[in-house]
């Protein structure tokens, strides 16, 4: 098997080499003479043409056509073709002017004399003014012109014909029902029903609000929650400790200008000179502060603004910089460290005792809830048409202590029968066998009107971060 030979690459033409290597001076020695016509063959033709001329014989290296005039027999002349020249115009005869001829030449030719005795026709159909003139001598009275317009009679012609295809629109409208003498009178159109198809209309917008009238204007839905992108990798985070950021954020970017009254709630734009220094170093090169945003973040109420830096500026005027998130925490949202205990109405270090008494007309009955207090220790009965609820607190021991009473007036409906005085069964006092140290209060709650402590409620695993916008959206 013969060995594999590499394929020979074709060399670039002399014209291509001349275009690339002429400026750099790296051309091969045979390229420049060939392109510029300085080879030995070109020199011999140049020197030989000075002594010998073969132009009339048509000898050359062309296609063999015999030159411009072609091949002709020897001893004859080629035909002569007349070339087109300028068009020949006829000469213009110029009349000579003698010394007796007038210097002013009339442009109009002479015509015959017009006879003015021919009457001029008058057209009176145009409806204008009729002017009558009369010739008079120098001693006669001036002429009187009659300028009153002639009376034109207007003629109106009308033709009436019956068209069976046309129907009066009045007959197409059905009359409204009329009620008279307890009867409902209704009339129907006498025209036959139409032959076209009725297409039902679809309701594109459905409103659940029945108080307002549905119109043709579409009802916009709720706006989707905007993602501000405050906490991204490309946004720098800069906390601001001063409260000036809430009222006058422009004072942190530039120095105070008394004549400037810009919108504190909108987008603030700044123009800085070439060399400047901001009052706050965190606000260096800031050219725009966008609208504020309220949000709840990590248990605090936070005010945020997006700032745009202009760290670089190109020759075309474009500014390049990063985005900065400036935020200030207004107040923390902290949870109480310990539970809040509800205090009773009558404050004392004793147990709860409730006495209710009521009297309707002449009847009265008392209810003693605390069995430790006999009826003799209760308040005397009150003869009044309203309830009196008494709350007294006693200690847990066997001996009742002083009571702190709170009187609350109550009322009962009148349809409840009044019964006799009732007293719950009494039991011997409880004596503890072990010392109580320290002593604590006990509250007995009988009822269902209580509030569950928030710590016993279910907690969500993920707490959402709601956003509250100052003006709905943030300018980009």
From Swiss-Prot:
InterPro entries registered for this protein in UniProt: Late_L2
Any one cellular-component term (Gene Ontology): host cell endosome
Compartments, as annotated in UniProt: Virion; Host nucleus; Host early endosome; Host Golgi apparatus
Motif segment (Nuclear localization signal): 1-12, 458-465
Signal peptide: none
UniProt modification remark: Highly phosphorylated.
Keywords: Capsid protein, Cytoplasmic inwards viral transport, Disulfide bond, DNA-binding, Host endosome, Host Golgi apparatus, Host nucleus, Host-virus interaction, Late protein, Microtubular inwards viral transport, Phosphoprotein, Viral penetration into host nucleus, Virion, Virus entry into host cell
Principal localisation: virion
GO BP terms: microtubule-dependent intracellular transport of viral material towards nucleus; symbiont entry into host cell; viral penetration into host nucleus
Gene Ontology molecular function: DNA binding; structural molecule activity
Cysteines engaged in disulfide bonds, as pairs: 21-27
Record family assignment: Belongs to the papillomaviridae L2 protein family.
Purpose of the protein: Minor protein of the capsid that localizes along the inner surface of the virion, within the central cavities beneath the L1 pentamers. Plays a role in capsid stabilization through interaction with the major capsid protein L1. Once the virion enters the host cell, L2 escorts the genomic DNA into the nucleus by promoting escape from the endosomal compartments and traffic through the host Golgi network.
Description of how the protein assembles with itself and partners: Interacts with major capsid protein L1. Interacts with E2; this interaction inhibits E2 transcriptional activity but not the DNA replication function E2. Interacts with host GADD45GIP1. Interacts with host HSPA8; this interaction is required for L2 nuclear translocation. Interacts with host importins KPNB2 and KPNB3. Forms a complex with importin alpha2-beta1 heterodimers via interaction with the importin alpha2 adapter. Interacts with host DYNLT1; this interaction is essential for virus intracellular transport during entry.
Protein name, entry field: Minor capsid protein L2
Gene: L2
């Amino acid at each position: 098997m013969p060995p594999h030979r590499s394929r020979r690459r074709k060399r670039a033409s002399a014209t291509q080499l001349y275009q690339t290597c002429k400026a750099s001076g790296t051309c091969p020695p045979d390229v420049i003479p060939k392109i510029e016509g300085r080879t030995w063959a070109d020199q011999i033709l140049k020197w030989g043409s000075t002594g010998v001329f073969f132009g009339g014989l048509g000898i050359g290296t062309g296609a063999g056509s015999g030159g411009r005039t072609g091949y002709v027999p020897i001893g004859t002349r080629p035909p002569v073709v007349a070339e087109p020249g300028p068009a020949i115009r006829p000469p213009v005869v110029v009349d000579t002017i003698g010394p007796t001829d007038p210097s002013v030449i009339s442009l109009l030719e002479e015509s015959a004399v017009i006879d003015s005795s021919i009457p001029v026709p008058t057209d009176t159909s145009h409806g204008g003014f009729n002017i009558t003139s009369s010739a008079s001598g120098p001693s006669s009275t001036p002429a009187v012109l009659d300028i009153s317009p002639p009376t034109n009679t207007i003629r109106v012609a009308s033709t009436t014909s019956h068209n069976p295809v046309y129907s009066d629109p009045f007959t197409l409208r059905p009359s409204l029902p009329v009620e008279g003498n307890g009867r409902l009178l209704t009339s129907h159109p006498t025209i036959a029903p139409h032959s076209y198809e009725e297409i039902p209309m679809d309701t594109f917008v459905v409103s659940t609000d029945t108080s307002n009238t549905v119109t043709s204007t579409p009802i916009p839905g709720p706006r989707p929650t905007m993602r501000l992108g405050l906490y991204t990798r490309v946004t720098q985070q800069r906390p601001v400790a001063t409260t000036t950021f809430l009222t006058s954020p422009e004072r942190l970017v530039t120095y105070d200008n008394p004549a400037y009254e810009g919108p504190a709630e909108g987008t603030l734009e700044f123009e800085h000179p070439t060399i400047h220094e901001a009052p706050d170093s965190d606000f260096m090169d800031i050219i725009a502060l966008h609208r504020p945003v309220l949000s709840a973040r990590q248990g605090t109420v936070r005010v945020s603004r997006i700032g745009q830096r202009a760290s670089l500026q190109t020759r075309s005027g474009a500014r390049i910089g990063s985005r900065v998130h400036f935020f200030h925490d207004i107040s923390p949202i902290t949870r109480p460290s310990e539970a809040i205990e509800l205090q009773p109405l009558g404050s004392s270090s004793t147990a709860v005792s409730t006495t209710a008494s009521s009297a309707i007309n002449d009847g009265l009955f008392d209810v003693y809830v605390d069995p430790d207090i006999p009826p003799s220790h209760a308040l005397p009965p009150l003869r009044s048409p309203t309830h009196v609820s008494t709350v007294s607190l006693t200690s847990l021991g066997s001996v009742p202590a002083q009571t702190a009473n709170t009187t609350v007036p109550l009322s009962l409906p009148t349809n409840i029968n009044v019964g006799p005085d009732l007293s719950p069964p009494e039991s011997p006092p409880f004596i503890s066998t072990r010392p109580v140290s320290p002593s604590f209060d006990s509250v007995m709650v009988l009822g269902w009107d209580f509030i569950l402590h928030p710590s016993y409620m279910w907690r969500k695993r993920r707490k959402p971060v709601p956003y509250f916008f100052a003006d709905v959206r943030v300018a980009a």
